[in-house]
């Protein structure tokens, strides 16, 4: 009887199974750790990141050079790039997570039954979480910190674009965590860039409890289509800002410019600007964008505002550009804005700029997105800006968690039932 040679997929499955079993063992230890122990370990991990600045930035420079040579887009390169300031921000985010309240063990609800039994619903970790991501070295630190603080083990599979950055960050993190008593297997980096490893993670039902993808549309779509493990994700960030007729012009101009141009490659960036037909200064909204180098694509009424606005194609309204391109439409009031958003939004973040509180309240109530804003830039769609510390991602689904997913979103719960000998009649 002949035996078939092992395939790449078989090898990847064996690799992921080994990582997951080690992660499960480490997670059981982590779940028993007192909150101060986890806090100290993460504080040490943040310090280790700061101490390894030179090594991490050198690794990132190698990734940036490779990315430029391989033709990565400006948006991807922006996500990949680390500077001393960005690295300091990553370390600060880890330290901030260390100081957050530990959700594990929180009593969500408690009730006494007529028969004397006492029921409690208590937060517990999800278990082993797989994070699959592209060109975002900050995710390595953010995900690790959030998982450890919430008692979960993490299996990290970063993109090939950031391979050197991820390894350097992971090395520093694990050293700091180990100094604080957290087993190294609690945060593991998949050691291969073979795509078969992604497939193995997606098929690891019973070994990995949840998958969180962070990356482009094709990655997230593949994860959602192929996973046999629950997925927490968003597919697109087609975010709208509606400037109502009542908006303060100075406020509207500042918010619109920031929402698009602060960082065009983040998932909270505005991709469509909706201008009320009776707003008094539409040119004051588009001119700063054009002057900043943003390409505008508009409908007929938008193009009448400024001749530099190009015609929009039908698919522009459904496009997440992640670069300095913006769709612009003029709408007849709130109802038409709501209809446009309902037709084209991805459920991520949508905003209104308005002085009329009744209009704003209706917008907040009727827009069905994970994050809905009034008089604020959509670039605030971020766990850190929400006071959650780092975030593991932004979820737009209906189940479990929506919006920025931080500590609470990485927990589930169990029921504790305390009796005194009750039997059921």
Curated annotation (Swiss-Prot):
Gene3D superfamilies named in the record: Aldehyde Dehydrogenase, Chain A, domain 1, Aldehyde Dehydrogenase, Chain A, domain 2
Predominant location: cytoplasm
Annotated pathway: Amino-acid biosynthesis; L-proline biosynthesis; L-glutamate 5-semialdehyde from L-glutamate: step 2/2
EC number: 1.2.1.41
Superkingdom of origin organism: Bacteria
Assigned GO CC terms: cytoplasm
Catalytic activity: L-glutamate 5-semialdehyde + phosphate + NADP(+) = L-glutamyl 5-phosphate + NADPH + H(+)
The UniProt record lists the keyword Amino-acid biosynthesis: yes
Any one GO MF annotation of this record: glutamate-5-semialdehyde dehydrogenase activity
SUPFAM superfamilies: ALDH-like
A Gene Ontology BP annotation from the UniProt entry: L-proline biosynthetic process
Keywords recorded for this protein, A-Z: Amino-acid biosynthesis, Cytoplasm, NADP, Oxidoreductase, Proline biosynthesis
Annotated localization: Cytoplasm
Family (UniProt): Belongs to the gamma-glutamyl phosphate reductase family.
PANTHER family membership: DELTA-1-PYRROLINE-5-CARBOXYLATE SYNTHASE (PTHR11063:SF8), GLUTAMATE SEMIALDEHYDE DEHYDROGENASE (PTHR11063)
NCBIfam families the record matches: PRK00197.1, proA
Protein role: Catalyzes the NADPH-dependent reduction of L-glutamate 5-phosphate into L-glutamate 5-semialdehyde and phosphate. The product spontaneously undergoes cyclization to form 1-pyrroline-5-carboxylate.
Protein name as it appears in the record: Gamma-glutamyl phosphate reductase
Organism of provenance: Novosphingobium aromaticivorans (strain ATCC 700278 / DSM 12444 / CCUG 56034 / CIP 105152 / NBRC 16084 / F199)
Gene from which this protein is expressed: proA
């Amino acid at each position: 009887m002949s035996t078939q040679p092992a395939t790449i997929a078989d090898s990847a499955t064996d690799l992921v199974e080994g990582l997951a079993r080690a992660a499960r063992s480490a997670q059981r230890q982590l779940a028993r750790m007192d909150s101060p122990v986890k806090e100290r370990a993460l504080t040490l991990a943040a310090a280790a990141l700061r101490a390894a600045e030179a090594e991490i930035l050198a690794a990132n420079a190698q990734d940036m050079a490779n990315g430029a040579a391989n033709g990565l887009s400006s948006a991807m390169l922006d996500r990949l790039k680390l500077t001393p300031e960005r690295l300091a921000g990553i370390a600060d985010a880890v330290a901030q997570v260390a100081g957050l309240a530990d959700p594990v063990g929180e009593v969500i609800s408690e009730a006494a039954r007529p028969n004397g039994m006492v029921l409690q619903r208590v937060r517990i970790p999800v278990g082993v979480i797989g994070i699959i991501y592209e060109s975002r070295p900050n995710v390595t630190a953010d995900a690790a910190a959030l998982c450890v603080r919430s008692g979960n083990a993490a299996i990290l599979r970063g993109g090939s674009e950031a391979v050197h950055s991820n390894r350097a960050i992971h090395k520093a993190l694990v050293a700091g965590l180990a100094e604080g008593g957290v087993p190294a297997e609690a945060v593991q980096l998949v050691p291969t860039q073979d795509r078969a490893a992604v497939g193995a993670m997606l098929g690891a039902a019973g070994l990995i409890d949840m998958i969180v993808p962070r990356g482009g549309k094709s990655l997230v779509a593949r994860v959602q289509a192929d996973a046999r493990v629950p997925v927490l994700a968003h597919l697109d960030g087609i975010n709208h800002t509606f400037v109502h007729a009542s908006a303060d012009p100075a406020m509207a101009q500042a918010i619109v410019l920031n929402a698009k141009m602060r960082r065009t490659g983040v998932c909270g960036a505005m991709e469509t600007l909706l201008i009320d037909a009776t707003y008094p200064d539409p040119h004051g909204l588009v001119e700063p964008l054009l002057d900043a180098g943003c390409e505008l694509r508009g409908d007929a009424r938008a193009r009448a505002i400024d001749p530099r606005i190009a015609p929009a194609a039908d698919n522009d309204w459904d496009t997440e550009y992640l670069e300095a391109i913006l769709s612009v439409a003029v709408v007849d009031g709130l109802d038409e804005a709501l209809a446009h958003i309902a037709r084209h939004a991805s459920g991520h973040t949508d905003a209104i700029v308005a002085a009329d509180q009744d209009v704003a309240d209706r917008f907040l109530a009727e827009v069905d997105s994970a994050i809905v804003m009034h008089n604020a830039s959509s670039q605030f769609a971020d766990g850190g800006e929400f006071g959650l510390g780092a975030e593991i991602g932004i979820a737009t689904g209906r189940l479990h968690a929506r919006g920025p997913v931080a500590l609470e979103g990485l927990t589930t719960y169990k029921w504790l039932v305390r009796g005194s000998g009750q039997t059921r009649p």
